[in-house]
Each structure stands twice: as structure tokens, then as C-alpha cells.
Design a protein with these regions (language model features):
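Transmembrane core module of solute transporters
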Residues: 19-69, 175, 212, 237-244, ...
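Flexible interhelical linker loops that connect adjacent transmembrane helices
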Residues: 11-14, 191-218, 260-275, 336-337, ...
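Transmembrane-helix bundle of Major Facilitator Superfamily
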Residues: 2-196, 330, 338-339, 345, ...
Length: 501
């Protein structure tokens, strides 16, 4: 590991505040809210579109506005947490996220909802890095880190699936607006808990923000994320899409160049030059590419092909959620203290890929219990074995003043991976479906059945791609994540644990 692993040895576990586990509950609650919100609105989107008069062309901005702001501003949010103080940034993010959620729930026009979703994404970009940073600096003993990151990784991995469940229940039994309003009471509880339990880090009030780095880095990320968001509806060769990718690459290249010269860089490059940490970032991005695309296909398959209601669709993901939590808290968290991280991450990716491969056999007549449930369980266990070690290993030994931006880099990998997965796998599915329908539609009377078969064919082809990408994630983890298992007791070079209030 590099210089970021240096620092004052961790204090003995006896010095840690016994209420730190209640602090973990607060952090986990906030993280669940952010991750859940990335998918909960998907279930509510058809109802919101009808209520607010959105067109098919602009409804995607309910999703795109959130992902653009979230993915584009994460590095800035992480550095703000380092400069201003983690607890203060965490509370500001919670309050802002709650206010934006209330605004979205009360939206009377499509534009008002789009603006609220963008604000949600902006405050999520402040909230998510500070949450992970607080976790990193609070739990430094290797055994405790395993338990804490097991819980955090379980929520980070299963939050999207939980979003489908909660979104389905709220949409069917209340209305779509409660998919946004639900964040308000969660945020209020988290703010009260944060003020009472979390330690106030001093921040660095005299430090300067790397403004050129912010403009270049955030601008590049926004262009890349927006490019992937537009790639599916417009096509990969559309001039706007190509221009966005080109601008994004140029800005990010300029960002890297500037970071080598900036007196106080937004993202110190030693963070991503570390082989193990870079491997964790890349593993996360690749794993999420497969996972996010799969969520989308399974949602459509259950609702369009199997004719599930929103509630039934959400509940169908419950075994996946339980499996992710089990893999993260009961397997990875117990083993990470004894085995190298890659010995969890690589088998986890293999397990998830096998689960995906089972889904490539889906047909219009497949059943949930026989054909879908076993695959979801395997995927969930595999993702649990990936997420927890990635979060724990990527943040291990990071200097406290860099914990926020390191946490932001992990979240950025996750967010950009999700954008790529949604765009890439959607394109594969759409192209494959169209080719199948063209080749097999010989009798107009069979149009409906052939179309359904074509849709499922497109899904299965895209799932093969997702499985291949998941295997690539496992290969990256096996080759790049070279960290050894942490020893029991204080970790050498770990940051000093912070106390809860």
C-alpha cells in the first residue's frame, strides 16, 4: 500500500466510545436512503408520468437528473467533507436531501420534479461520501471494521432491491409521491441521531478548495454520465453522445494533469495509484455495470412478461436482498479478518456470474420459483461477497484528511458503473430484440407472441454480457487487489478512531 496507509497507529479498542454502534445505525440509515432512492422512483415513474403529463421523451429526466447531479458532484462532496468536517457535511446533506424530497413529492409540474431530483442528487453527493468517511474514521480495529463494513456493504448492495420493494408498496397502496416523501422522516431520524451520536471532526477551515479541479473533474464526470444516459435513446453514434464522451474524456485528462500540479488537489493521485485501491474501484464499477442492468431487465420481465404488479415485482427481489445481506454480514464480514480480500471478491463475482447465467435460459413461460429464485440467491450471495470487502479494503489506512474524497471515489465508481450498465446493456437488449423479431416475424397473426419472445431474447443476450462483465470484475479483483488480511487488533497505519459525541 502507498503513503495513504501511514498515520498514527489506532488506539486500543477500549478507547472507542461504546455508543459507536448506534452511530453506525445512523450512518447506515442515511446510506440506505441514498441507495434506495436510485431505484424507488423507477416503480413510481409510470404513475408520475401520467399525473404530471410527462412525455415519453422527457420522462427519463426523472432518473437522469438524479444520476447527473449525484455522479458529477461526488468528488466535490467528498472534498467538502474533508475541508468542512464530516459530521457537519453529513447533517447538511441529510437536511438538503429531505427538503429536495419534499419538493419532489409536492411537484405540480414535470419541471418541478426534475429540479427536485437534481437537488436530491446534489445533496446525495454530499451525504454519501461523508457517511462512508464517518464509518472509516470511527471503526479502525480490523475485527470491528469487518462487522461495520458488513452492515454498510449489505445496505449498499441491497438498497437498490429494497427500493423496488418499498416503491411497489408505496405506489400501490398510497401514491407515487410517497416514494419521495418517505425520505423525510428517515432523514429527520438520521439528523437527530447524528447530532446526538456522531463525533464532530474539526475540518480544515484554512484549506483552499481546488476550484480548477472541481470544474474539470465534475465537468468531466457530468459529461460522461450524461453521455451514457443519452446513448440508449439516441444511439451510440449520435453526434451529441459522441461529443459528450469526447468532452468528458478531455476534461478528465485535463483533471488528471492538473492534479499533479495543484498545490492542494481535489483528488490526490496517490489514492488511485495504489494497486489494491485502484483494483477495488475498478471491481466496484464492473460489478455494478452488471447488477444495475440486470435490475432493469428483471423489473421489465416480471411486469411485462409475467404480468406482476408493482408490489409483486418488489417482493420478488426480497430473496436477492436477503442473500446480499447474508453474504455481506454473515460470510464476508466474518472472513475478511482472516483471508485476503480478493479471496472473497473473486469467488463472489464468480458466484454472481453463475446466477446471471442461470437467467439466460429464461423464456416467456419461465416460472419464478424454478427459474428465477435460485439465480437471485446466487447473485445476492456473490454481490455480498464483493461489496463489503471493496468498501473495507479501499478505505483501509487512508489518512483522515483524505477519507472523504476516497469515499467519494468509491461512490463515483458505483454511480458511473450504474450509468454504463444501464446504457450498454439496454442497447444490447434492444438491438438483439429487434433482430430477433425481424428474423422470426413471418406471420402478422403471430406478432404479439413473437414480440414477447423477442423481448425475452434481448434480455437473455444482455444478461450474457452482464455475466461476462461480472467475470471480468472477478479477474480484476484477483489480479489487482493484493492486500493481505488485516491482523487482529489495531491495524498498522490505520487512522485514529473518532469518538461519537
Amino acid at each position: 500500500m502507498d503513503a495513504t496507509r501511514t498515520g498514527e497507529p489506532a488506539r486500543a479498542a477500549a478507547d472507542a466510545d461504546p455508543r459507536r454502534w448506534w452511530g453506525l445505525v445512523v450512518i447506515a440509515l442515511a446510506q440506505l436512503m441514498v441507495v434506495l432512492d436510485a431505484t424507488i422512483v423507477n416503480i413510481a415513474l409510470p404513475s408520475a408520468q401520467e399525473d404530471l403529463g410527462m412525455t415519453d421523451g422527457n420522462r427519463q429526466w426523472v432518473i437522469t437528473a438524479y444520476t447527473l447531479a449525484f455522479g458529477g458532484l461526488l468528488l466535490l462532496g467528498g472534498r467538502i467533507a474533508d475541508l468542512v468536517g464530516r459530521k457537519r457535511t453529513f447533517v447538511i446533506g441529510l437536511i438538503g436531501f429531505a427538503a429536495a424530497s419534499a419538493l419532489g413529492g409536492a411537484a405540480t409540474t414535470a419541471g418541478m420534479l426534475f429540479a427536485a431530483r437534481a437537488l436530491q442528487g446534489a445533496f446525495a453527493a454530499v451525504l454519501a461520501p461523508s457517511a462512508l468517511s464517518l464509518l472509516t474514521t470511527t471503526f479502525t480495529d480490523p475485527k470491528e471494521r469487518g462487522k461495520a463494513f458488513g452492515i454498510y456493504g449489505a445496505l449498499a448492495g441491497s438498497g437498490s432491491a429494497i427500493g423496488f420493494i418499498v416503491g411497489g408498496l408505496l405506489t400501490e397502496y398510497l401514491n407515487w409521491r410517497w416514494c419521495l416523501y418517505v425520505n423525510v422522516p428517515i432523514a429527520v431520524l438520521a439528523v437527530i441521531g447524528a447530532l446526538a451520536l456522531l463525533h464532530s471532526s474539526p475540518g480544515h477551515p484554512g484549506a483552499r478548495l481546488d476550484v480548477p479541479g472541481v470544474l474539470l473533474g465534475c465537468g468531466g464526470l457530468v459529461a460522461i454520465v450524461y453521455g451514457f444516459a443519452e446513448a440508449q435513446p439516441r444511439g451510440w453514434t449520435d453526434p451529441l453522445v459522441l461529443a459528450l464522451f469526447a468532452v468528458g474524456v478531455v476534461l478528465l485528462a485535463a483533471f488528471v494533469w492538473w492534479q499533479t500540479r495543484a498545490p492542494v488537489p481535489l483528488l490526490p493521485l496517490h489514492i488511485i495509484k495504489d494497486r489494491t485501491r485502484a483494483g477495488c474501484f475498478l471491481t466496484m464499477a464492473l460489478a455494478v455495470i452488471g447488477m444495475f442492468g440486470l435490475f432493469l431487465f428483471m423489473t421489465y420481465y416480471l411486469q411485462v412478461i409475467l404480468d406482476y404488479s408493482p408490489v409483486m415485482t418488489g417482493l420478488a427481489f426480497l430473496p436477492l436482498t436477503v442473500a446480499i445481506i447474508t453474504g455481506s454480514t454473515q460470510i464476508a464480514a466474518r472472513l475478511l479478518d482472516h483471508v485476503a480480500p480478493r479471496l472473497l471478491m473473486a469467488p463472489g463475482a464468480l458466484l454472481a456470474a453463475v446466477g446471471m447465467m442461470l437467467l439466460t435460459g429464461l423464456t416467456v413461460h419461465s416460472s419464478y420459483a424454478a427459474d428465477i429464485l435460485p439465480a437471485l440467491i446466487l447473485m445476492g450471495l456473490g454481490m455480498g461477497l464483493i461489496f463489503m470487502p471493496v468498501f473495507a479494503t479501499a478505505t483501509a489506512g487512508v489518512a483522515p484528511q483524505d477519507s472523504g474524497v476516497t469515499s467519494a471515489t468509491i461512490n463515483t465508481s458505483q454511480q458511473v458503473g450504474g450509468s454504463i450498465g444501464t446504457a450498454l446493456l439496454n442497447t444490447v437488449a434492444t438491438t438483439s430484440s429487434a433482430a430477433y423479431i425481424t428474423a422470426h416475424l413471418t406471420d402478422p397473426a403471430q406478432r404479439e407472441s413473437v414480440t414477447r419472445e423477442g423481448i425475452v431474447h434481448g434480455y437473455t443476450v444482455a444478461i450474457w454480457w452482464a455475466a461476462a462483465i461480472m467475470l471480468l470484475a472477478g479477474l480484476v479483483a484477483a489480479l489487482m487487489v493484493t492486500a493481505k488480511p488485516p491482523k487482529h487488533g489495531a491495524a498498522q497505519g490505520a487512522p485514529v478512531p473518532e469518538q461519537v459525541a
